[in-house]
Amino acid sequence: EIYTLSLHDALPISSWERNRSFVEAFLLERMPRVKLKHPQGTFIFWLDFRDYGLSAQELQRVLTEKAGVALNPGISFGRQGEGFARLNIGCPMAQLEEGLSRIFKAFETL
């Protein structure tokens, strides 16, 4: 099961800020090897997985096959995006929690 956000869903700013704080705390506490590139004026985070030493293809395989989540591959934005994935935090908190928990489980054995 892969989670996505319907085109008709919308979040108030307070929800977006709560989601941002949740992602920051989750990564710091549970996945400190994943660095967060803070967005400027957007609800899309760049997650830096380079510390795992995976190729762009390996990173996508772990995310989609092991974690069952679909993130935008950073490599789609050029070679400088290799090792990164883009996370949309403009979704309900339950989806964000589920997705990050799946990513955590997939990466804890790497």
Regions found by a protein language model. Give the residues of each.
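Short beta-strand-to-loop capping motifs
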Residues: L47-D51, I89-C91
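A short, small/polar-residue-rich loop/turn motif at beta-strand boundaries
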Residues: S55-R61
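Short amphipathic alpha-helical/adjacent loop interface patches that line ligand
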Residues: I13, R20, L100
